[in-house]
Regions:
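Gly/Lys-enriched N-terminal cap/neck module of very large, oligomeric protein machines
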Residues: 19-144
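N-terminal acidic, proline/glycine-rich, low-complexity intrinsically disordered segments
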Residues: 1-15
């Protein structure tokens, strides 16, 4: 029987069988995505709740997270009048987490992972999408 995981300290077993905490998304920066002109959202470990009035940008916040996770981008998400939308996520990485599958995928694609991993998605008004992680451009599918 497996023990339940604490939502504030998600863990996985590395190759040597020891547990390590997961990298966690600490900051999301959003520019020109839907109704959001420019926003920075600082997240904390555990549960973060996003609330607001109709039209405040809650859906665009969820869309920004989906872009960071490699979802297909839609040109209609770009703010009217803007050339492109940009979403940047900062993941906090603890020492010794390089064995995590997502971090290995970024390193295998040429990205650099240190105490934080910066992931960026740019979506043009024409629908083209570019992804970068760890300072290196890479295929969007690497983020998935």
């Amino acid at each position: 029987m497996s023990r339940p995981q604490d939502a504030t300290n998600s863990t996985h077993r590395n190759g040597s069988g020891t547990e390590q905490s997961e990298p966690w998304l600490s900051t999301v920066e959003i520019s020109n995505l839907g109704v959001i002109h420019d926003a920075t959202v600082d997240l904390s470990r555990g549960l973060t709740v996003i609330t607001g009035e109709t039209g405040a940008g809650k859906t665009m916040m969820v869309q920004s997270l989906s872009l960071l996770l490699g979802r297909r981008a839609e040109s209609g998400w770009v703010r009217h009048g803007a050339d492109s939308a940009v979403v940047t996520g900062v993941y906090e990485v603890s020492p010794g987490q390089t064995d995590h599958p997502a971090l290995r995928a970024v390193e295998d694609a040429g990205g650099v992972v240190e105490d934080e991993l910066i992931v960026t998605r740019r979506v043009s008004a024409a629908g083209r999408s570019v992804a970068a992680a760890g300072g290196t451009r890479m295929p969007v599918r690497t983020l998935a």
